[in-house]
Amino acid sequence: MLDPAASTARQRVAELVRQLLAKRGIDRAPSAEDDLGESGLSSLDIVNLMLAVESEFDLKIPERDMRPANFRSIARIEALVASLMDQSTPVGG
C-alpha cells in the first residue's frame, strides 16, 4: 500500500496505473484524462487495477460500479474512489 499521508487520491491511482504499465514494459505515465486502454492496459490489467484500488483505499467497489467507463482514466477512477469514500466505511473498519 502506498503512503496515504504522502499523496492525493489522484497520485495514488496514478502510481497504481504506472506500476501496471511498468509490468507490461511501458515506461510512460498517462495524464489524468488519458484512456488507459489506449495507454497500454488490457482488460485483465483493468480488473487488476480494480482490485488494487480496493486494496489501496481499503474499500469495496460495488458490482454496479464495476463498469469500464469508471476505469477509463485516472480522473474517472479518482472520482469513483471519492464517491465511494463519501458513502461508505472502510472494509477493515
List each model region and its residues.
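Phosphopantetheine-dependent thiolation modules in NRPS/PKS and related acyl-activating systems
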Residues: 2-41, 45-51, 55-93
